[in-house]
Amino acid sequence: MSVLVYSFASFVLGWCLRSGITYFTRLMETSS
């Protein structure tokens, strides 16, 4: 049970981090 929650949390965290990085790079490209 805890392993499933841990893997799901890491997946969501990784997805948020990746989308945040792509959004940040896109914002920097448009600003410059």
From Swiss-Prot:
<keyword id="KW-0472">Membrane</keyword>
<feature type="transmembrane region" description="Helical">
    <location>
        <begin position="2"/>
        <end position="24"/>
    </location>
</feature>
<keyword id="KW-1043">Host membrane</keyword>
<dbReference type="GO" id="GO:0016020">
    <property type="term" value="C:membrane"/>
</dbReference>
<dbReference type="GO" id="GO:0033644">
    <property type="term" value="C:host cell membrane"/>
</dbReference>
<dbReference type="GO" id="GO:0044423">
    <property type="term" value="C:virion component"/>
</dbReference>
<protein>
    <recommendedName>
        <fullName>Tail virion protein G9P</fullName>
    </recommendedName>
</protein>
<keyword id="KW-0812">Transmembrane</keyword>
<comment type="similarity">
    <text>Belongs to the inovirus G9P protein family.</text>
</comment>
<keyword id="KW-1133">Transmembrane helix</keyword>
<keyword id="KW-0946">Virion</keyword>
<comment type="function">
    <text>May initiate with G7P the virion concomitant assembly-budding process, by interacting with the packaging signal of the viral genome. The assembly-budding takes place at the host inner membrane. In turn, G7P and G9P are present at the end of the filamentous virion that emerges first from the bacterial host.</text>
</comment>
